[in-house]
């Protein structure tokens, strides 16, 4: 029992197959489990290697993002006087549109309604005059 327990502990620690052979010379089932653990360890290394490659790609993307930000800052630095003016112009346009368009549209609709009512009365009056 102690040798089997020692084998399990050694397999968990990842010792070499030579150490397994030295400890487990009496049992024949133990080397079979040792080879099984070593075959499982090999794919784990390849999976870990793939994850490492993905991390490198992420770093490259982050570097590209920072580079773009730096370019924007460099372009904005010479045009510092024009950038605030553009922002003010956009704000002025927004306020101007909000103040002018809804008020004009409401007045136009109200004028159309009153104009239509006046047309109806005018159309009804001439029709009544020839009959009388």
From Swiss-Prot:
Record note on modification: Proteolytic processing gives rise to the active protein.
Location(s) in or outside the cell: Periplasm
Record region (Disordered): 20-132
Top-rank lineage group of the source organism: Bacteria
Keyword DNA-binding: no
InterPro entries in the cross-refs: Acid_shock (IPR023497)
Propeptide: 22-90
Ranges of biased composition (kind: Low complexity): 20-45, 76-90, 100-109
Signal peptide: 1-21
Principal location listed in the UniProt entry: periplasm
Basic residues: bias regions: 62-71, 110-119
Keywords: Periplasm, Signal
Biological role: Required for growth and/or survival at acidic conditions.
Family indicated by similarity: Belongs to the Asr family.
Name of the featured protein: Acid shock protein
Organism (species): Enterobacter sp. (strain 638)
Taxonomic lineage from the root: Bacteria, Pseudomonadati, Pseudomonadota, Gammaproteobacteria, Enterobacterales
């Amino acid at each position: 029992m102690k040798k089997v327990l020692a084998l399990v502990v050694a397999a968990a620690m990842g010792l070499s197959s030579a150490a397994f052979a030295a400890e487990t010379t009496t049992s024949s089932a133990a080397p079979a489990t040792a080879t099984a653990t070593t075959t499982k360890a090999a794919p784990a290394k390849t999976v870990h290697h793939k994850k490492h490659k993905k991390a490198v790609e992420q770093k490259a993307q982050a570097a590209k993002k920072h580079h773009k930000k730096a370019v924007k800052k460099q372009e904005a630095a010479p045009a510092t006087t024009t950038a605030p003016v553009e922002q003010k112009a956009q704000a002025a346009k927004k306020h101007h549109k909000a103040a002018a368009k809804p008020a004009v549209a409401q007045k136009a609709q109200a004028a159309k309604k009153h104009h239509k009512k006046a047309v109806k009365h005018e159309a009804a009056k001439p029709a009544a005059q020839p009959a009388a």
